[in-house]
Amino acid sequence: MLNPAGIPAQSQRSRCSISRGILSIGVTANHYAEGNDVVAVEPSEESVQKRWDDHPYCQIVGSTDALRQMPDESFDVILCHNVLEYAPDREEILREFYRLLKPQGILSLVKHNRPGRVMQMVVLLNDFDKADALLSGEDGYSADYGTIHYYEDEDIIKWCSGFRIKETYGIRTFWDLQQNQDCHKDPAWQEKMVAAELRVSQMQPYRDVAFFHHLILCKKEV
């Protein structure tokens, strides 16, 4: 697939600067590429071929090996959204993130939240067996990406003690609980729902049962 500049994704690596900007893990970089310098790393060639690329950015097909080749303190922001759950080498990835992040940079990490997944199984999918399995500590499964290896927010600090959690938000606390699909298409409903989601995103009782958690991490001050 060609980007807007007509450069094949695999050949862009030598042509883009990573002296500043954003590192995005996965294929969601297009959203952030407008007005930013973005480098994206995705191990799946198939996913890269299907990605949106109407904004120019550097797409690398690779995984942890690609991160190892990048210079220290290359990025102001690192985005890792719903990725670590599927990675076998999470601790190594986090150490690379720490190395690649500038001293005042931030790591934006979105992760599955086990209690929220249990809510989804019971309330939305009526699947009590999977809910019981999750409550017993078993992993989940995604048809697109495979096994979901759940982890706790605090595990990030255990795996890489140089990070600290600056902020924690709940994502999709209410949205999917509304099963009237016609509502989802209504812009007025969407606006009110987003306002409600934002209002409770940092309130612990609601955050605890959100489908996802959004962690903002930074380097500990030395």
Predicted regions and their residues:
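A short acidic, Gly/Pro-enriched loop at the edge of an enzyme's catalytic core
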Residues: R68-I78
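Conserved class I S-adenosyl-L-methionine
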Residues: I106-L135
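A short glycine-rich, Lys/Arg-flanked "PGG" loop and its adjoining helix->strand segment in the class I
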Residues: E91-I106
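A short SAM/SAH-binding and catalytic strip from SAM-dependent methyltransferases
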Residues: D76-R90
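A C-terminal cap/extension of S-adenosyl-L-methionine-dependent methyltransferases
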Residues: E167-V222
